[in-house]
Each structure stands twice: as C-alpha cells, then as structure tokens.
Amino acid sequence: MRLMPSLSFPPRFFHRPRRAAIALMALAALAGGAAHARQAAQAEPLPAQIIRLAQQGRTDEALAKAREYLEREPQDVQMRFIQSNLLAQSGRTDEAEAALVQLTRDYPELAEPYNNLAVLHAASGHLEKAREALETALRLDPGYATARENLGDVYLRLAASAYEQAAARPESAGEARQRLTDKAAAIGKLLR
C-alpha cells in the first residue's frame, strides 16, 4: 500500500542546467568530437549531474558525488536535501532520516525536509510522528500541496487504524463490528 508519494526533489531547490551549458553540449555534439562533448558535460552543474545520475538509476554513483561535493560545501542545503533523498531511495532510511532531522535543525524555515521526514516516518508505521512533521511543514508553507495531500493520507491511515482497533475490541459485536470493518476497508481502498 502506498501511503505517500515517493520522495521527490523539490523544484525550488533545483537549478536547471544553464542554457549556455546545454548549448555548449549541443554544439560539441554537432562538431562530432566526443572529447568536446565530455568537456561540455563537465560544464553541467554538479547538482544537475547528480540528479541525472539518480534518474538513470545510478544512485551509488550519485551518492558518491554528493558526498564529494558536501565535503567542499557542507552547508549547501540543496545538496544536503538531494543526498537525503538518495539515501532514502537506496534503502538507507536511518541515514536519510538523520540527514533530514539535521536539515530541520539547520534550516527550520524549510518545509520540504519536514515533508520527506514525514514520508519516512509513515513508511515505518510512525503515523503520529508523520502527522506532526506534516503539520510543521504546513505551518511553514500553507500552500505546500504535496504536504497537504500527504497529511490527508496520514489522517486516512490513522482513521483506518482507529476503526480496525475499535472492531477488534470485545465490546464491538455483530453489526457494529461489521460497520467498523467496512469503514476501515473503504479507507484502505482510498489509499491504494
């Protein structure tokens, strides 16, 4: 069951490859020189290279480049956020969570780390922690649609859990139990 959308890089943290770099790569390709194309690719900003590697499924390579970059620029919030996403995508959720928690401490005004922290909390079954993180994200950025959708999903999961727990209680019998079970099942369908 998918509780929330997968982790995503927030667009406002991204810098698209500069038009000049793209034009340079195209020019090098037209000239037919592989060496020129390699030089042009090196003109691509490192964050864009890392994102491209991740999109190609080369997460370990992207993580290595992110680490290398952060050794030189340890306070680069964009790269730290990208690194946390890469860690999560590679299954290193404890490291991703630690990186996101540190981002929330260093940059408490940013909503995105709270949203992605909530995704990790929800995935590990900590729905109350996820709710708290999402509510923080929305206090910081009330227009953050992804966080709002994710909070709705968390509320649905919490409701389904409450119905399931109520149905399992000994005092819930017959029609009441069936009603509670049906409600939990209906919510489960919404979350698929």
Question: Predicted regions: what is each one?
Answer:
Residues 43, 77-78, 111-112, 145, ...:
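Helix-start (N-cap) detector for alpha-helical repeat units in TPR-like alpha-solenoids
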